[in-house]
Amino acid sequence: MTAQDRLRAARGFVLDVDGTLVLGTRDGGDFTPLPGAVELTGLLADRGVPYVVFTNGSAKSPGYYVDALRALGLTVPDEGVLTPVSSAIDVLTARGHRRVLVLGTRDGIGAPLTDAGLRPLFTGEHAGADAVLIGLHRQFGMADLDAAYDAVSAGAALYTCSEARFVATATGDKLGTSRAIAGAVHAVTGVHAELVGKPSRHAVDTVARRLGVPAHELVIVGDDPELEIEMARRAGALGVLVGNDGSADADLRLDGVDALVAMLEPTHRR
């Protein structure tokens, strides 16, 4: 089956955010939609094709992204955005973790954990943590490293939202902090953080459950060969690389999601 055949037969779509549907600024400012983003989400919604928007960012909650993307004219269902915290919650819950030291933001990580019935803990109030979750944390400091060391040394499991080095923005690549923080914690504990965001199998499983679609029948669209295309490879899904001139071995390579719209418009029916 060709890539085009698999695209036509796909039962669900996973759409990246930064560099795929929109571009933000390095300071986290307003998003600008990329060509085809509004049309792609509208097309999938109109045809009843299940899809989720999956960002590897953990600074903001899924609800924030729903509102922000809708404000740009994109069609996004109420529960249509996933972040690494979404898959983290699945993992933490399945493994019986309840008290989670958060190295990240209260809005992006703390609030979703609370909504899921878990208890987020922060530096200075972290006694009894049974897990540590690393996310975007630009104010990370020695007190946080001490807290992580205490928790992991006492037996807490260590997880990270992302291993991405950079995030695409309209004003240039922005450093992803999760990877650096995980490296610092490893340096003092000897423990490697387990990845729960893209491209991990945990992320694949969360998407498949949310959409009710087998992973191998998904189309995963993004601009990062190390994230979306690798995620597609692990899932056995169709990987569509957009806006990237690298040498990644993607199933389809397109200039942007507007080209994907052009391919889907005459052909895709559920």
Language-model segments: residues:
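Asp-based, Mg2+/Mn2+-dependent phosphohydrolase catalytic module
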Residues: 1-46, 63-79, 89-270
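Conserved phosphate/oxyanion-binding catalytic-loop motifs
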Residues: 57
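Active-site environment of divalent metal-dependent phosphoester hydrolases
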Residues: 60
